[in-house]
UniProtKB/Swiss-Prot annotation:
It comes from Papaver somniferum (Opium poppy). One of its GO terms (biological process) is methylation. Pathway: Alkaloid biosynthesis; morphine biosynthesis. This is Thebaine 6-O-demethylase. The gene is T6ODM. Its cofactor is L-ascorbate; Fe cation.
């Protein structure tokens, strides 16, 4: 029986490329991709809702409006979205449509490369960056039905020479421009969140510096068609680890779901929009005012799905904990302080994706 080509992970393991597996037209998926029931089935009485209008939508033009009433209304919407949902879409964001189109076509082009070409970017020993899969900690761990390409893009000194500089020139130049635009958009959101949270003036500079000099990473995701989509998962349910994630859907195939009050809600990306979500670190910094949310990616039997997630996180040297002005006698600290972001990153490298397990470990 023909076998899929293997890709080497940074921990020394070798696993099949799911994109290559899908080319074999299997009747059944390999056992390592069969999820435990609790990862697939909904809680008793829960359902999947396909109404994307339940997801808040933030208009960046209104958020930046010089008209005080318009700006305040949109700021209130942003605050509500972060408190009550942890997920929202942004429209009128100012990112040039031609750049977004280039991102989509170049990422599609990368995954269309031959396996031999893609493995030139495979993960090196002890590293999570590169082509492969993430969060694989054991030989018997259930695998996601996806291939990914992960790399740090900011600050510049974190870019790996064997990855970023070796990308095909059109992809590298496109990612370079996209990285800059995502950084600008993230800082608009962080600055407005500070205002909505009424962070005291003495702390605003310190909070902004955590992210203005912070890290940015990108993860390109490829979810091929799956012969048994009811048994597999594209991306295991989890909350994101860092500050803010900005997601761009590459094609028209849906798959992102978020968990709200025991219900999985299917997110339908709006045209010319990004999906944004709060991460665990931002929940810690806001002392639980803003919430990170469990989400997952599901797969289907007929169509491939692609996306790119851009993660905006603190600088590695930043000490993580609740912002002091958000701690009061009525709202005591909910999370531990004192660890640097870099230390927490190293700790998370040893974890598999598992809901909000990291955040739970940080609770007081």
């Amino acid at each position: 029986m023909e076998k899929a080509k293997l890709m080497k992970l940074g921990n020394g393991m070798e696993i099949p490329s799911v994109q290559e597996l899908a080319k074999l037209t299997l009747a059944e998926i390999p056992s390592r991709y069969v999820c435990a029931n609790e990862n697939l089935l909904l809680p008793m009485g829960a359902s999947v809702i396909n109404d994307h209008e339940t997801i808040p939508v933030i208009d960046i033009e209104n958020l930046l409006s010089p008209e005080p009433i318009i700006g305040k209304l949109e700021l209130d919407r942003l605050h509500f979205a972060c408190k009550e949902w942890g997920f929202f879409q942004v429209v009128n964001h100012g990112v040039d449509a031609s750049l977004v189109d280039s991102v989509k076509s170049e990422i599609q082009g990368f995954f269309n490369l031959s396996m031999d070409e893609k493995t030139k970017y495979e993960q090196e020993d002890g590293d999570v960056e590169g082509f492969g899969q993430g969060f694989i900690e054991s030989e018997d761990q259930t695998l996601d039905w996806a291939d990914i390409f992960m790399m740090f893009t900011l600050p510049l000194h974190l870019r790996k020479p064997h990855l970023f500089s070796k990308l095909p020139v059109p992809l590298r130049e496109t990612i370079e421009s996209y990285s800059s635009e995502m950084k600008k958009l993230s800082m608009v959101l962080f600055n407005k969140m500070e205002k909505a949270l009424q962070v005291q003036a003495a702390e605003i500079k310190g909070m902004s510096e955590v992210f203005i000099d912070g890290t940015q990473a990108m993860r390109m995701n490829y979810y091929p068609p799956c012969p048994q989509p009811n048994l597999a998962i594209g991306l295991t349910s989890h909350s994101d680890f860092g500050g803010l994630t900005i997601l761009l859907q590459i094609n028209e195939v849906e798959g992102l779901q978020i968990k709200r009050e025991g219900t999985w809600i299917a997110v339908k990306p709006l045209p010319n929009a990004f999906v944004v979500n709060v991460g665990d670190i931002l929940e810690i910094m806001t002392n639980g005012i803003y919430h990170s949310v469990d989400h997952r990616a599901v797969v289907n039997s007929t169509n491939e799905r692609l996306s790119i997630a851009t993660f905006h996180d603190p600088s590695l040297e930043s000490v993580i904990g609740p912002i002091s002005s958000l701690i009061t006698p009525e709202t005591p600290a909910l999370f531990k302080s004192g660890s640097t972001y870099g230390d927490l990153v190293e700790e998370c490298k040893t974890r598999k994706l598992d809901g909000k397990s990291f955040l739970d470990s940080m609770r007081i």
